[in-house]
C-alpha cells in the first residue's frame, strides 16, 4: 500500500512537470519574444513547486514508511530509484532551484538572439551567471570533483574519470579508423547533393520518416525550432522539432534523431508507472542510444539508402538525377571533419563530444571562464578535427545545451553511441531479418524489440540488461568498421 500511496502523491508532480514541458516547448516554437520574462517566472514557479513537493515532510515520511515495509523485488528496485532521486532533489535549496530555472530560461532566449547575430559579448555574461550557479550547485552534492556532480544528474553510473578513460580508448580507435577510411577514399571523395533544397519537400520527408519509423501521428507533432529537440508534454503527447535550410538536407538526420527520442518516450510504461522512475528513461545515455540508433544505425545504413532512394528521387528529382542507392549511401556517410556537431558524420561526431567534455571539465574543475570558452573551443577544434570556426555561431554558440545549464549532458551522446553499437551487435543475432527489414522499410520488428527490451522497462533495468555487459568501445568500433568496409 505504501508504494501505491507514493504513486498517488507523485501524480501532482507529474502534472506540474507536464505543464513545465508544455511551457518549454511553446517557448522554443511559438511564444512571442516579448513574453520571455513572464515565461521565466512561470517556469521558475513550476519547478519550485515540484521541488517543494519532492522535499516535503509528507513525501519524506512516505519514503521512510516504504523502507520499513515488506516489498517485492520490483518494489525494492523502485524504492531504490525513488531514494536516489530524493537524495539529489533534497540536496538543493528551493531558492537555488527557482533562481537557476529563471536564469536558464532567460539565457536560452538570449542565446538564440546572440547566435543569430554572432554576438558572444551579448551571450557570455549570462552564460557566466549560469556557470556560477552550477558551480554553487556542485557544492551541495558529495562528489569527487565539481564536474562529477553535474555528470551524475544525466547518468548516475559515471564520473568524469570513468568517461575520460572510455573517451581515450575511443579516440585511439577512431583515429586509426579515420586513417583507413581516408586511405580508402570512397567516403571522402564523394560529392554532396547539389543545393538548393526547397523547404516544402524537406517537411514532407521529415513527416514521412516520422510515420514509417512508427511514431503515431495522432500522438505527436513536428515543428521548427532554432535547435532540434524532443519533449514529452504528457502521456500520448510527444513533440519533436527540426530545422530546415535550403543549403543542405541536415533536417533529414535531425528528424530521425528526434524521432528516436520520441519513440523511446512513447514506449515508456506510463499507463502503470506514470510519475515514478519506472515511467522514465533509464538514463540520458540510454535515451541518446535510441536517437542515435534510429539516426545512424538504421537511417545511415546501406539498406536504408536503398529503401529511401525512390522517395528521395520523388521529392528531389533534380538533385537526385544520376544518384544510385550506393551513391546515396556514400553521400549520407561522407566522412570529412566539420565544424557543426549535429551535421557531423559518425567517424568524427564523437570528437565533437570529446571537445565539449574537455571544456566542461575545464570550466568546473580548472576554472575556465565563459569569456575564454571560444578561444579554447577553437584551439581544440583545430587540434582534434583540423578545422577552426570563423564565427561564434559555428563555434561555441552552436548548441543550446549550455544556455539551458545542461552541463554534463554532452558525454551522454557518445555513451549513447557506444550503447547503440552494442545493441546493434545484439539485435543482429536476435532479429535474423534485421538488415532485410530495413531495406524493405519494415521497422515494426525492430521497434517491437526496442519496446520489449528497453522502452517498456523504464528504470527497472540496468544498461547491462540491454547490452549484455558494461558499456564498451569495441562493439561500436566494429560496427563502424563494418559500415565503412575497412
Predicted features, each with a name:
Residues 142, 246-268, 288-292:
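Active-site recognition of the HExxH zinc-binding catalytic motif
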Residues 1-158, 459-463, 471-486:
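A well-structured
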Residues 167, 171-174, 199-203, 209, ...:
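All-alpha helical catalytic cores of prenyl diphosphate-utilizing isoprenoid enzymes
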Residues 21, 34, 38, 52-55, ...:
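C-terminal, non-catalytic "cap/extension" segments appended to globular domains
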Residues 38, 99, 126, 166, ...:
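Secondary-structure capping and boundary motifs in well-ordered enzyme cores
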Residues 103-250, 459, 469-470, 476-480, ...:
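Contiguous, non-catalytic segments that form substrate-binding/exosite surfaces or channel walls
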Residues 6, 142, 257, 291, ...:
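Divalent metal-coordination and catalytic microenvironments
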Residues 279-321:
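Post-HExxH zinc-binding segment in Zn-dependent metallohydrolases
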Amino acid at each position: 500500500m505504501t508504494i501505491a500511496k507514493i504513486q498517488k502523491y507523485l501524480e501532482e508532480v507529474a502534472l506540474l512537470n507536464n505543464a513545465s514541458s508544455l511551457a518549454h516547448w511553446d517557448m522554443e516554437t511559438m511564444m512571442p519574444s516579448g513574453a520571455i520574462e513572464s515565461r521565466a517566472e512561470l517556469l521558475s514557479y513550476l519547478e519550485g513547486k515540484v521541488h517543494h513537493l519532492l522535499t516535503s515532510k509528507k513525501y519524506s515520511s512516505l519514503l521512510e514508511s516504504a523502507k520499513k515495509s515488506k516489498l517485492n523485488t520490483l518494489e525494492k528496485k523502485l524504492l531504490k530509484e525513488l531514494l536516489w532521486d530524493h537524495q539529489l532533489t533534497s540536496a538543493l535549496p528551493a531558492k537555488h532551484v527557482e533562481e537557476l530555472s529563471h536564469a536558464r530560461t532567460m539565457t536560452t532566449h538570449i542565446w538564440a538572439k546572440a547566435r543569430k547575430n554572432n554576438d558572444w559579448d551579448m551571450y557570455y555574461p549570462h552564460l557566466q551567471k549560469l556557470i556560477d550557479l552550477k558551480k554553487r550547485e556542485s557544492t551541495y552534492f558529495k562528489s569527487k570533483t565539481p564536474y562529477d556532480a553535474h555528470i551524475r544528474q544525466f547518468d548516475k553510473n559515471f564520473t568524469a574519470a570513468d568517461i575520460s578513460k572510455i573517451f581515450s580508448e575511443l579516440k585511439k580507435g577512431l583515429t586509426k579508423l579515420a586513417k583507413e577510411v581516408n586511405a580508402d577514399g570512397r567516403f571522402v571523395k564523394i560529392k554532396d547533393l547539389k543545393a538548393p533544397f526547397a523547404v516544402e519537400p524537406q517537411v514532407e520527408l521529415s513527416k514521412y520518416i516520422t510515420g514509417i519509423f512508427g511514431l503515431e501521428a495522432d500522438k505527436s507533432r513536428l515543428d521548427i525550432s532554432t535547435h532540434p529537440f524532443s519533449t514529452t508534454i504528457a502521456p500520448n503527447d510527444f513533440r519533436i522539432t527540426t530545422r530546415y535550410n535550403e543549403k543542405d538536407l541536415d533536417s533529414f538526420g535531425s528528424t530521425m534523431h528526434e524521432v528516436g527520442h520520441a519513440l523511446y518516450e512513447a514506449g515508456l510504461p506510463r499507463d502503470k508507472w506514470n510519475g515514478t522512475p519506472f515511467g522514465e528513461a533509464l538514463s540520458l545515455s540510454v535515451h541518446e542510444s535510441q536517437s542515435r540508433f534510429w539516426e545512424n544505425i538504421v537511417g545511415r545504413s546501406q539498406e536504408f539508402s536503398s529503401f529511401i532512394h525512390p522517395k528521395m528521387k520523388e521529392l528531389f528529382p533534380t538533385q537526385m538525377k544520376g544518384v544510385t542507392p550506393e551513391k546515396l549511401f556514400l553521400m549520407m556517410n561522407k566522412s570529412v571533419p566539420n565544424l557543426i556537431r549535429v551535421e557531423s558524420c559518425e567517424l568524427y561526431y564523437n570528437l565533437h563530444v570529446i571537445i565539449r567534455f574537455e571544456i566542461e571539465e575545464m570550466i568546473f574543475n580548472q576554472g575556465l571562464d565563459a569569456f575564454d570558452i571560444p578561444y579554447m573551443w577553437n584551439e581544440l577544434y583545430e587540434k582534434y578535427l583540423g578545422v577552426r570556426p570563423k564565427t561564434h555561431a559555428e563555434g561555441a554558440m552552436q548548441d543550446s545545451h549550455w544556455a539551458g545549464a545542461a552541463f554534463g549532458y554532452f558525454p551522454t551522446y557518445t555513451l549513447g553511441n557506444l550503447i547503440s553499437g552494442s545493441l546493434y551487435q545484439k539485435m543482429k543475432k536476435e532479429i535474423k531479418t534485421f538488415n532485410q527489414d530495413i531495406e524493405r522499410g519494415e521497422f515494426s520488428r525492430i521497434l517491437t524489440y526496442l519496446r520489449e527490451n528497453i522502452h517498456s522497462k523504464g528504470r527497472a533495468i540496468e544498461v547491462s540488461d540491454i547490452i549484455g555487459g558494461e558499456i564498451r568501445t569495441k562493439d561500436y568500433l566494429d560496427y563502424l568498421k563494418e559500415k565503412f568496409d575497412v
